[in-house]
Amino acid sequence: MASSTCYATIPAMSCRGQSTITRFGPNNLFLGKQSYELPLMRRNAKFTVRSMREDNEKEEQQQQKQQQTHDGGPDLTPNRTEVTTKRTVDLFSFDGLAPERINGRSAMIGFVAAVGVELATGRDVFSQVFNGGVMWFLLTSAVLVLATLIPIYRGLSPEAKNNGFWNSDAEIWNGRFAMIGLVALAFTEYVKGGPLINV
């Protein structure tokens, strides 16, 4: 009679088996009576898992805020859309709030200024840039960067004032068209070799 005992590395898992040899069969195959016992694995349920969607939390916060305003009177705080991040690195990342807005605002001002100066003096975009335009570009860019970042650092997002004709979507699309228009104006004047509008 042979007996064997094995223990695994996982706690609470062990096996004990007993094997009784009864005979050898043809071709020397082992035939025997085997019995193995495995204890029940018990779960250690000392913790609970809770999963919630963020939407539910936001809805609950809005409901609580509405209940407070109904109970205590009108809400006098300004309507602010919360900005989740205020790190400058995150704001200037590829999908951040700042890059497209700053570039769009610069392009809108730049396009209007380039066409206005061209109509007034007859100089093309390149002569405007090389004759004092770089200083104006740097000054305007600094003002636009500050004008874009200060409200974001104060907790306002561009979508906070989305009512009426002036909204953030219109600003984004106007900025995109101005970027395309400014590049097209410079390219056309480069190919033509002079100002687009001759005065």
From Swiss-Prot:
Pfam families: Chloroa_b-bind
TM regions (residue ranges): 130-152, 172-191
Region (Disordered), start-end ranges: 53-82
Bilayer topology: Multi-pass membrane protein
Major location (coarse): plastid
Induction per the UniProt record: By light, ABA and desiccation.
Tissue: Preferentially localized in the chloroplast-rich palisade parenchyma cells, in extracts of desiccated leaves, in seeds, but not in roots or untreated leaves.
Keywords tagged on the record: Chloroplast, Membrane, Plastid, Thylakoid, Transit peptide, Transmembrane, Transmembrane helix
Biased composition (Basic and acidic residues): 53-62
Domain of life from the UniProt record: Eukaryota
Subcellular localization(s) per the UniProt record: Plastid, Chloroplast thylakoid membrane
One Gene Ontology cellular component: chloroplast thylakoid membrane
Family: Belongs to the ELIP/psbS family.
Function: Possibly exerts a protective role during water loss.
Protein name: Desiccation stress protein DSP-22, chloroplastic
Source organism of this protein record: Craterostigma plantagineum (Blue gem)
Gene (name only): DSP-22
